[in-house]
Amino acid sequence: MWSDILGLALFVSLNPLLLGFILLVLSRPRPVPNLVVFWVGCLIVNVPGFLIPLFVLRAVPSFAEFAEDLTTADPSSGIEPFQLGTGIFALAVSAVIALRMWVKRRANQPVLVGSGAGDRGPTDDASTLVLDSGAREAREPGAIARMILRMRSALQRLVSRLHQEWENGALWVALVFGLAYIPPPPLVLLVDTIIGGSGAPIGTQIIAVFVFIMAMLAVFEITLLSYVIAPRRTQAVLEPLHEWSHRHRQMILLVLFGAVGIWELIVGLGVI
């Protein structure tokens, strides 16, 4: 059991999604405290995420077969629904990020202004006045339009507030990111099946769950331990990494979601 869960934890620790989260957190002010809070958030969500299914599997053996049917490939088509859905979602997020980067790049390009504005005649001016009058009437919002405008304004204020908190390095943002690192059901089922099928006492199985989670987050522990032992040297390594990840934050997200989406899509379609 121990060799199986440690080997699996080492493989999961190299997950590009987890590495991308680290780079994303490092792109914020106060990277080390944000890493600590992110690590705590991961523990908060992963400990019950692995323990509760383990207790359920021990209490209801028939539930293990039901959970396995939900996460395994279809015998006829070879399609794995969970992985396929995850891949489609990740690719959709990657496409949205790429579109936003393209729109921002287009908006930053200089706009050439023509020189024909001074050649307008009286007819053009009259037409402009008529069009302006009609445009003013069309711009008068109704009740539904005013409600939509208020909702959009409130949403813009919320997004602006969240962006401000992100730029200021608020620790609760890192905690939310840590809580969002939820273990995927196939991984939970695999780990709990290995641990539960070992026949070890319940106390040993609980310890095995904690060992797996700590090994899965080994990148965080190594970074934090290095900072405690040699803060200056660790900071010297973190600062250039922090600056690089801050400059390429959007690209990191794009590559991260794209790579995860393609991999999950390939697995979900049964290619591998």
Curated annotation (Swiss-Prot):
Coiled coil: none annotated. It is a multi-pass membrane protein. The chain crosses the membrane at residues 5-25, 36-56, 79-99, 171-191, 206-226, 252-272. Belongs to the peptidoglycolipid addressing protein (GAP) (TC 2.A.116) family. The keyword rRNA-binding does not apply. Its main location: membrane. This is Peptidoglycolipid exporter Gap. Disruption phenotype: Deletion mutant synthesizes GPL at a level similar to the wild-type strain, but is unable to transport it to the cell surface. GPLs are retained within the cytoplasmic compartment. Mutant is not able to slide. Required for the transport of peptidoglycolipids (GPLs) to the cell surface. Keywords: Cell inner membrane, Cell membrane, Lipid transport, Membrane, Transmembrane, Transmembrane helix, Transport. The lineage of its organism: Bacteria, Bacillati, Actinomycetota, Actinomycetes, Mycobacteriales. The keyword Methyltransferase does not apply. It is found in: Cell inner membrane. GO terms for cellular component: plasma membrane. It holds the Pfam family SfLAP.
